[in-house]
Amino acid sequence: MNILCYGDSNTWGYIPNINGYSKDAIIRHYDEKDCWWYSLKNHNKLIVNGLCGRCIAHENRWLKNRNASATINSEISQYTNLDLIILQLGTNDCKSEYEDSPDVITKNLDMLLKIIQKHTCAKIMIISPSKIIENNKITQKYYKGAQSKTIQLDSCYKRLAEQRNFLFISGLNLDIGEDGEHLTKLGHKQLGLQVLSKVKELSPAELI
């Protein structure tokens, strides 16, 4: 099976860092074997496209090419014969600077997926954002109100998946690190097991 994993820093494998937003921060990622998508590598051709700061529908003021809705046409056209696309997006859209409600974030995701479906007939799986924990200087500054948003997004994403016949994985209760937004190794393992189980359920007919 040809699988594209497309997402943000939790797809990239960002190691939680309480000083991650400071200008001298050293940003590191987990070894690939500790990332949630590694469990899919057996018997599958895997493409991983994760970028720190990637949003569904917003530009990032520090990093270029992080608006998925603006870049997806050129990105998705690079990949052929995809059977499954797994999207892990929405966390960055919860930042207080964007002022997006859960409904707006979900509508933006739906529009992004419609763009993707113009290029491919691949099955779609969406992973809802993990619950932002507003208990530290990072989340209190950049993610004010995001804990409630991520809780609501879980049901919004699930409803979208049901309406559009997408696969759905809840990321809500995965283990989160000290920065309140990034997965720990345990969180990656928890997610990897869920995704692998869902992928194993797919029959060839469902991939057409």
Q: Model segments located where?
A:
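Substrate-gating cap/lid alpha-helix
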Residues: I133-G171
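Conserved beta-strand segments of alpha/beta enzyme cores
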Residues: K45-I47, K123, N165-L167
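Conserved SGNH/GDSL esterase-like catalytic core that processes O-acyl groups on lipids
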Residues: N2-L4, G13-M111, I115, S148-I151, ...
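Residue-level recognition of beta-strand->loop/alpha-helix junctions
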Residues: V48-G50, S128, S170-L172
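Short, flexible active-site-adjacent loop segments at beta-strand->alpha-helix junctions, enriched
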Residues: S9, C52, T91, S130-I133
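A short helix->loop->beta-strand "cap" motif at the edges of active sites that frequently abuts
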Residues: Q117-I124
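Short hydrophobic segments within beta-strands
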Residues: Y6-G7, I127
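Histidine-centered active-site loop/cap adjacent to the catalytic His
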Residues: D179-I208
